[in-house]
Amino acid sequence: MINLGDKQSIIVVAMSGGVDSAAVAAMLHAQGYNVIGITLQLYDHGMAVGKKNACCAGQDIYDAKMVANKLGIPHYVLDYESKFKESVIENFVDSYLQGETPLPCVQCNKSVKFKDLIKTAKELGAAQLATGHYVRKINGDNGAELHIGIDPAKDQSYFLFTTTKEQLDYLSFPLGWFTKDETRKLASKFGLEVANKPDSQDICFVPDGNYKNVINKIRPGSSKKGKIIHVNGFELGEHSGIINYTIGQRRGLGIAYNEPLYVIKIDPNNNIVYVGPESALNMQEFIIKDVNWLADEIKDNEKLEVAVKIRSTRLPSLAEISKLGDDKMKVKFLSEEKAVAPGQACVIYDGERVLGGGWITRDIIITL
């Protein structure tokens, strides 16, 4: 039983068309809450119709509507294409052009799904906005805290580190206490056709998985050839455009050499891709920017031992963090890590609690 307060309250559910948000809507409706479903149309409908297994595609909008009809709850589709293009797609493209490896799902949660959905939910008089994310909101001594979901295979806390304290107070994550199998069983119990619908896998606005086509469409002429240089300083060949490379990449370099080579650094200003041996990927310190902090404030000279994740699929690593001004932090691993990629998120944990996070910069990752 999920307790969201007064049963007469309006609860807006962000319905993506998948099984998770459908199960949330059905569960809250069954418990007597006044549920309203909202689905965002985020990109070109023609593209969406042809795209399967992606969040907020045309089929997903239809599926969300069918779930709402079955439950007998109001459902609205809001057109956020222009906002999504500006805040997410163009940010994604420009990040690649800066030699970064972007994380568009985090930008979408930050700039569109939470920010704008919360605004809409409040305009509808809702007491809370509920989503199908696998994270937990726990009331601590100093207010709401963001914790990992109990199902480690589905935990989505890495993608929600930009959630502010004010947003967290208004949000609800009922599925943080469920495993994926339990969610599907719940959806089946309510007779929802999406109970066995596959999870979304791809970036929603990349219809064929080829992000380079999207970049070249938004920013024509982006694939400019340039030099591939070894970290020791000698030229090895020519690259096909920095958008085709990411830190740690080994395959597709097109270079014959006497040892395996990896992408070590991308220099967008000079259009250079630096490569080197795997050992050159090792590093211990880096800087994160645009830090969002959900815990007690860190003092200027304080060093805090934490666990950090630098990729959604990696296990947390022990590190020490310290402040660098208002919105930056220095992160120092206790042991060296490989392939820390600018543009990715560094999310900071204390056990199961999310303390905050920021965006990895190229500062002091490597000095050539």
UniProtKB/Swiss-Prot annotation:
One Pfam family matching this protein: tRNA_Me_trans
Record's subcellular location: Cytoplasm
Keyword Magnesium set for record: no
GO cellular component terms attached to this protein's record: cytoplasm
EC numbers, comma separated: 2.8.1.13
Annotated catalytic residues: C108 (nucleophile), C204 (cysteine persulfide intermediate)
Sequence segments annotated as region (Interaction with tRNA): 154-156
Keywords: ATP-binding, Cytoplasm, Disulfide bond, Nucleotide-binding, RNA-binding, Transferase, tRNA processing, tRNA-binding
Top enzyme category: transferase
Coiled-coil region list: none
Catalysed reactions listed for this entry: S-sulfanyl-L-cysteinyl-[protein] + uridine(34) in tRNA + AH2 + ATP = 2-thiouridine(34) in tRNA + L-cysteinyl-[protein] + A + AMP + diphosphate + H(+)
Example of a GO MF term: ATP binding
Domain of life where this protein originates: Bacteria
One annotated GO biological process: tRNA wobble position uridine thiolation
Feature type site, description Interaction with tRNA: H133, Q344
Residues reported in the UniProt entry to bind ATP: A14, M15, S16, G17, G18, V19, D20, S21, L40, G132
Disulphide connectivity of cysteines: C108-C204
Cited function: Catalyzes the 2-thiolation of uridine at the wobble position (U34) of tRNA, leading to the formation of s(2)U34.
UniProt record similarity statement: Belongs to the MnmA/TRMU family.
NCBIfam families, sorted: PRK00143.1, trmU
Name of this protein: tRNA-specific 2-thiouridylase MnmA
